């Protein structure tokens, strides 16, 4: 690769690092072009999967301010640059690696910190943002319904007490009249 090509490749990779919310570093040894194409489709529109030379990636990472990944840039390396939510892309990579043993997840980078393989897998095991928001909304709706029931309970209790008191007075009034009538008859 000629020097101007290397400079432009480093600049492109640097921009990918800067524009990504997360990156997952993988080893692709043994994958076919068809496998990689399938993986790119599985990652969706929020991620790109790029193969690059390790020396160029190291230089680009340093220029982007990404630290702690140099040990991962050994052997045939490809990087999934993720824009947006990292959960879905990490899940796609984990599932693809499960089905294709040739893909090895080496680690990643997110929120200014290097990630181990276990941390990438933990991210992949999380539920998507939409599902978590739906669960939160459901929990809030249930709690609001309970609160409404609690606020309505005192009013209904007062109404029941008033009705019971009225019935009691009516019964006492009727009971008081009955002995008076019995005394008048005698």
Curated annotation (Swiss-Prot):
Q: Name one GO biological process term.
A: translation
Q: Which InterPro entries match?
A: Ribosomal_uL10 (IPR001790), Ribosomal_uL10-like_sf (IPR043141), Ribosomal_uL10_bac (IPR022973), Ribosomal_uL10_bac_type (IPR047865), Ribosomal_uL10_CS_bac (IPR002363)
Keyword Ubl conjugation listed: no
Q: Which UniProt keywords apply?
A: Ribonucleoprotein, Ribosomal protein, RNA-binding, rRNA-binding
Task: Specify whether Ribosomal protein is a keyword of the entry.
Answer: yes
- Entry-linked Pfam families: Ribosomal_L10
Q: What is the superkingdom listed in this entry's lineage? A: Bacteria
Gene Ontology cellular component? Answer: large ribosomal subunit
Output the Gene Ontology terms for molecular function. Answer: large ribosomal subunit rRNA binding; structural constituent of ribosome
The protein's role, per its UniProt record: Forms part of the ribosomal stalk, playing a central role in the interaction of the ribosome with GTP-bound translation factors.
The subunit structure is: Part of the ribosomal stalk of the 50S ribosomal subunit. The N-terminus interacts with L11 and the large rRNA to form the base of the stalk. The C-terminus forms an elongated spine to which L12 dimers bind in a sequential fashion forming a multimeric L10(L12)X complex.
According to its UniProt record, which protein family does this protein belong to? Belongs to the universal ribosomal protein uL10 family.
* Descriptive protein name: Large ribosomal subunit protein uL10
Organism expressing this protein natively: Rhodococcus opacus (strain B4)
């Amino acid at each position: 690769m000629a020097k101007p090509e290397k400079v432009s490749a480093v600049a492109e990779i640097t921009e990918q690092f800067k524009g990504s919310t997360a990156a997952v570093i993988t080893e692709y040894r043994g994958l076919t072009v068809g496998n990689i194409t399938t993986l790119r489709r599985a990652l969706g529109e929020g991620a790109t999967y790029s193969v690059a030379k390790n020396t160029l990636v190291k230089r680009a990472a340093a220029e982007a301010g990404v630290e702690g990944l140099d040990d991962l840039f050994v052997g045939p390396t490809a990087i999934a640059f993720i824009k947006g939510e990292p959960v879905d892309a990490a899940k796609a990579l984990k599932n693809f690696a499960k089905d294709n043993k040739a893909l090895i997840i080496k680690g990643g980078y997110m929120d200014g910190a290097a990630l181990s393989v276990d941390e990438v897998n933990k991210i992949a095991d999380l539920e998507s943002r939409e599902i978590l928001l739906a669960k939160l909304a459901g929990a809030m709706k249930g709690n609001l319904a309970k609160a409404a029931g609690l606020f309505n309970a005192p009013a209904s209790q007062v109404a029941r007490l008033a009705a019971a008191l009225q019935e009691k007075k009516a019964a006492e009034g009727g009971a008081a009249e009955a002995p008076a009538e019995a005394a008048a008859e005698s």
